[in-house]
Amino acid sequence: MKKIVLTGGGTAGHVTPNIALLPSLKEAGYEVFYIGSYTGIEKTLIEDLGIPYYGISSGKLRRYRSLKNLSDPFRVLHGLFQAKRLMKKIKPDIVFSKGGFVSVPVVLAAGSRHIPVIIHESDMTPGLANKIAMRKATKICCNFPETLKYLPEGKAVLTGSPIRQELLLGNKAAGLDLCNFTTDKPIILVVGGSTGAVHVNDAVRSILPELLKDFQVVHLCGKGKMDDSLNGTPGYVQFEYISEQMRDLFAISSIVISRAGANAICELLALKKPNLLIPLSANASRGDQILNANSFKEHGYSMVLTEEDMNKDTLLAAVRKLYADRHQYIINMEKSEQQDSIDKIMNLIKDNSK
């Protein structure tokens, strides 16, 4: 039986594509191991699935000045030694990395032992972690055609992003029961990402009285970001994070308000869910979500509202227009050619395993 190490973490977007590959990996006869951080969201998500999980030390790679820039390199170095020991212990035939800071020592450790590495880059332009790791990569998968020009020729492969197939199997009755909603009003799903989005959360809450006149709202706020004063509000329910029943929430939703992380928007595309994207601002990120959102807007898959332009009036108007035009967005998404990502990635894994 061949062995594969999966790595990636920090946010759910660096984990869910790995989870999406699990059924196909098991069907192909791979023994799966996961290397992540000690306390990241990946630990909870992977251990809940019964996959052998190994935590290592990791430090954030920053582009800005911070006192932690003095200590984090030592954490990365410690993580590298830990990852090397794990490579020696597990002896994987291949490593698949979804990125995030914890993946860097894992990829470097694999490269030092001449273990094939496949990296997946979901965003339009490579993040810092993948920029460092791609030097050791055998192949680099990407999500957008525009990304190919940023990747080494001969290594880059356009695959799209793997989507958890169970998301396509949502149960409307289960979703309505979870939220205690009815079928009397359409439902808006608000997704701030696994770590939450304070600006999006606050903006949605500011127009909640108006929204609830015409819609029901299910709000995924992020850990520690719920507003207890809103508990019990008719037509509104909030959760920190939902994993297994996410498919049921998608099933009941007419439209979705979301950040523009690459994996999140690819799930919306696969589900053909009309969506309003509010990308993380360039001031708070490297601007990758803005690029992702604009690409989907140009293809007619999404409406986009920037944080800078977002206020009560613009957000409410955007939601109403999105709902009014929802059928056209569905038609546009049905024409998309971004599919079969899992099959493409599995072929790369099989072809490049030792």
Curated annotation (Swiss-Prot):
The Enzyme Commission number assigned here is: 2.4.1.227
Which residues are involved in binding UDP-N-acetyl-alpha-D-glucosamine? 11-13, 164, 194, 289
What is its pathway? Answer: Cell wall biogenesis; peptidoglycan biosynthesis
Where, by residue number, does the polypeptide cross the bilayer?
A: none
Q: Does the keyword Cell wall biogenesis/degradation apply?
A: yes
Which InterPro entries does the record match to this protein?
Answer: GlcNAc_MurG, Glyco_trans_28_C, GlycoTrans_28_N
Please verify whether the record's keywords include Transferase. yes
GO terms assigned for molecular function? UDP-N-acetyl-D-glucosamine:N-acetylmuramoyl-L-alanyl-D-glutamyl-meso-2,6-diaminopimelyl-D-alanyl-D-alanine-diphosphoundecaprenol 4-beta-N-acetylglucosaminlytransferase activity; undecaprenyldiphospho-muramoylpentapeptide beta-N-acetylglucosaminyltransferase activity
The places in or outside the cell where this protein is found are: Cell membrane
Q: What class of enzyme is it?
A: transferase
The reaction(s) annotated as catalysed by this protein in its Swiss-Prot or TrEMBL entry are:
di-trans,octa-cis-undecaprenyl diphospho-N-acetyl-alpha-D-muramoyl-L-alanyl-D-glutamyl-meso-2,6-diaminopimeloyl-D-alanyl-D-alanine + UDP-N-acetyl-alpha-D-glucosamine = di-trans,octa-cis-undecaprenyl diphospho-[N-acetyl-alpha-D-glucosaminyl-(1->4)]-N-acetyl-alpha-D-muramoyl-L-alanyl-D-glutamyl-meso-2,6-diaminopimeloyl-D-alanyl-D-alanine + UDP + H(+)
Q: How does it sit in the membrane?
A: Peripheral membrane protein
Cellular component terms per the entry's GO annotation = plasma membrane
Swiss-Prot/TrEMBL keywords: Cell cycle, Cell division, Cell membrane, Cell shape, Cell wall biogenesis/degradation, Glycosyltransferase, Membrane, Peptidoglycan synthesis, Transferase
Which SUPFAM superfamilies does UniProt cross-reference here? UDP-Glycosyltransferase/glycogen phosphorylase
Listed GO biological process terms: carbohydrate metabolic process; cell division; cell wall organization; lipid glycosylation; peptidoglycan biosynthetic process; regulation of cell shape
Q: Which Pfam families does the entry link to?
A: Glyco_tran_28_C, Glyco_transf_28
Function, in words: Cell wall formation. Catalyzes the transfer of a GlcNAc subunit on undecaprenyl-pyrophosphoryl-MurNAc-pentapeptide (lipid intermediate I) to form undecaprenyl-pyrophosphoryl-MurNAc-(pentapeptide)GlcNAc (lipid intermediate II).
**NCBIfam families the UniProt entry points to:** murG, PRK12446.1
Similarity comment: Belongs to the glycosyltransferase 28 family. MurG subfamily.
Instruction: Tell me what this protein is called.
Output: UDP-N-acetylglucosamine--N-acetylmuramyl-(pentapeptide) pyrophosphoryl-undecaprenol N-acetylglucosamine transferase
What is the scientific name of the source organism? Answer: Lachnospira eligens (strain ATCC 27750 / DSM 3376 / VPI C15-48 / C15-B4) (Eubacterium eligens)
Q: Which gene encodes it?
A: murG
